[in-house]
Amino acid sequence: MPLQIYISGKYFDKENAKISVYDHGLLYGDGVFEGMRSYGGKVFRLKAHLDRLWDSAKAIWLTIPMTQEALAQAVNDTLAKNGIKDGYIRLVVTRGAGSLGLDPNKCSDPQVIIITDHIQLYPKEFYENGLTIVTASTIRNHSAALSPRIKSLNYLNNIMAKIEGLQAGCVEALMLNAQGEVAECTGDNIFIVKRGKLLTPPIDAGILEGITRDAVIELARAAKLEVLEISLVKHDVYVADECFLTGSAAEVIPVIKVDSRIIGDGQPGPVTKDLTRRFHQLTRE
């Protein structure tokens, strides 16, 4: 059976899953989304993802036309309908169809879309051997303009930095904020290890509050590792003993080179490996 896509209470074959060309999600990137993983048929931290979705929607004055409980059920039903156990879920809420102007008050009912599929963001060898990344010249959105804490459908800021990375032969790129501090990568949060401590930029550096980021911080603290959410600059990354990225799609992936600087000994480090193991164990609980 073709992949089934959920759109506002109905299921459609992948080829027939359509929304209006007047939807402001398409015309202006006006909407919010979440990317989630399922392991063994269970969505990892579904409640946390839905809480973040609701926060993003509230921040842009978008009312999600169903309860969290109903949406959670729809996500699980869509997974089951497609027979997916270990997969990726893309949950989208658009503003709905409106006029060609910006006025969101002219939009009709918001559209809720659920896509369940499989994803492999990076090749297996990158998880085994580590990524090489570069710093993009594209600055992460200033929080006073469009907060990175809002997971909106407008990802052009990230895409521009992603293009820079790809043009440099890298699949991921590091983004700085307007103050020149390390923010995050185009689709992942960043961590470094220095002298046995785990360091990561704080939320007010202009980053998305990653669900996987939070999980890794919890795992590190449970393992008695000191975790500091502090301001970092590129120099801190260059001289780190280890570096890794986290994200729902990426999970936990090591970084072994940044801007041509070798991180540590150029191999995924012991802390990275241990936290990766702990994370994979957590997802199966």
Question: Which residue ranges define each predicted feature?
Answer:
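Glycine- and Gly-Pro-enriched alpha-helical subdomains that act as flexible
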Residues: L174, E181-I203, E209
